[in-house]
Design a protein with these regions (language model features):
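C-terminal helical subdomain
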Residues: 190, 194, 213-292
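Rossmann-fold cofactor-recognition segment
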Residues: 57-73
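Canonical Rossmann dinucleotide-binding motif of NAD(H)/NADP(H)-dependent dehydrogenases/reductases
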Residues: 2-39
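Active-site loop of short-chain dehydrogenase/reductase
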Residues: 5-6, 62-63, 90-91, 140-154, ...
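A short, exposed helix-loop element centered on a Lys and neighboring polar residues
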Residues: 133-134, 177
Length: 292
């Protein structure tokens, strides 16, 4: 049995879904680079640090490596990937999870009535995911193996929170499709997949439920554990038929049924298809069109 660890990279892993995804990959024995900006617990109202996440990864059986990285900074991102390649020589799994999420997303009113900073999700969310994928793809194409995962959600197809939020989720799905198409046409064993997460039981959601248990308490029963999508990413990476998913947008709850993955106690989170009748968009697989 090989003692070489799978090298994974999870962006936005100080807390929330990113922290859980990194923890899950640690349970599968991966070397997990966790990035984010939070070094000290008091630096963010919701707590969590990249160091704490890395410690959890190692305690779970993997190797956690915390790297402070501002994904809005091209220099930070470039330096980070250079470090990973110098230390590991490969990148096997990339999970694009970093996004600029603010509490004001849930405020009432039109987008013009809320802070302009909500548009930061276009930079740390859309652009940051493209940049990270660009660097990771260099390694994956060269080694002819790899998986790029985008964390997305039903906001790609129906209104949730704000136009910037919806644009971010829709972009995750379309980038996965288009990148997957280019990997296919290049004949490479690299897959790009977008996963619709459900209501993830993050620190933020716990605060929402605690603020009004009568109104929001039902969210817990249908929620996903933060580790849930991490287990899905591992199942995809190790699936011999991974190529069949390349370019796809998958509802995480449905993917879990296929792989036999559940939350604690065997609980299966509901699918958006069943609960809301919402499904991912079917993109056209026309041959790539390029000038020249």
């Amino acid at each position: 049995m090989s003692d070489i660890r799978t090298v994974a990279f999870v962006t936005g892993a100080s807390r929330g879904a990113g922290q859980g995804i990194a923890h899950a990959l640690g349970q599968h024995g991966c070397t997990v680079y966790v990035t984010g900006r939070t070094l000290n617990p008091g630096d963010h109202a919701l707590g969590g640090t990249i160091g704490a996440t890395a410690t959890q990864v190692t305690a779970a059986g993997g190797e956690g490596i915390a790297v402070q990285c501002d994904h809005s900074s091209p220099d930070d991102v470039r330096a980070f990937f250079a470090r990973v390649m110098a230390e590991q020589g490969r990148i096997d799994i990339l999970v694009n999870n970093a996004a600029a999420v603010y509490d004001e997303l849930s405020l009432p009113g039109g987008f013009w009535e809320r802070p302009l900073k909500l548009g930061d999700m276009i930079d740390v969310g859309i652009r940051s995911s493209f940049d990270a994928s660009w660097y990771a793809a260099q390694a994956m194409v060269a080694q002819n193996d790899g998986l790029i995962v985008f964390t997305s959600g039903a906001g790609a197809e129906h209104y949730v929170f704000s136009p910037a939020y919806g644009a971010h989720k829709a972009a995750m799905d379309k980038m996965a499709f288009d990148m997957g198409l280019e990997f296919d046409h290049a004949g490479k064993n690299v897959a790009a997949v977008s996963i619709w997460m459900g209501a993830v039981m993050t620190e933020r959601l716990r605060l929402v439920i605690a603020s009004d248990p009568v109104k929001f308490g039902a969210l817990e029963a249908g929620s996903e554990e933060p580790e849930f999508t991490g287990h899905l990413a591992w199942a995809l990476y190790t699936d011999p038929q991974r190529a069949a998913r390349n370019g796809a947008t998958c509802i995480g709850a449905e993917l879990a049924r296929e792989y036999g993955i559940t939350c604690a106690g065997g609980r299966a989170p509901p699918s958006y298809r069943d609960s809301h009748g919402v499904v991912p968009r079917a993109f056209s697989r026309l041959a790539p069109v390029r000038a020249g």
